[in-house]
Amino acid sequence: MAVLVLASCGGDKKETANGVENQNTTEHSAVAPADVIMMTVKAMNDAAANLENAATADELIDATADLYSEMKRLQANYGEVMLAVDTLSEEQMNELYPEEMKAMEEAAINYSVAMMGKADLMENLTPEQEERFMKIIEAEL
């Protein structure tokens, strides 16, 4: 695997086969970037399945909240690795993680299709449901 050195306020980061290591501290993540990408893919695929199974607007909102909650959990646990991955260009990502990026693209499409398939539920939100949904979305912005 190619070695990539990244600069950030936390110090220089070096991508290794075992994860991203902060060169200025003893912090080290034992999780490889490819693993974090696949955890994100799993979260998106789970959310797409939950959306597809949603029969009510509340279930749709819950599925969205679950995805955002899982993404926050991943960020809290693997933020340093995610930050390093986020600094890569799309070309670098595709070069370093071709299978993972293909899975990510498919997961994003599946999630979008699942959400579009529930447009009827989104169009009929009550004011309370709309407010709840917007709070979930705004918390992520």
Identify the function of each model-found stretch.
Residues 13-69, 136-141:
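Immediate post-signal-peptide N-terminus of mature secreted/exported proteins
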Residues 30-50, 94-141:
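C-terminal amphipathic alpha-helix
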Residues 48, 71-82, 108, 112:
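A structural signal for well-ordered alpha-helices, especially hydrophobic packing surfaces
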Residues 5-8:
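C-terminal motif of bacterial Sec signal peptides marking the signal peptidase cleavage site
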Residues 11-12, 20, 80, 118:
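Intrinsically disordered, low-complexity regions
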Residues 57-64, 74-101, 118-122:
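Short, solvent-exposed, charged loop/turn and helix-capping segments
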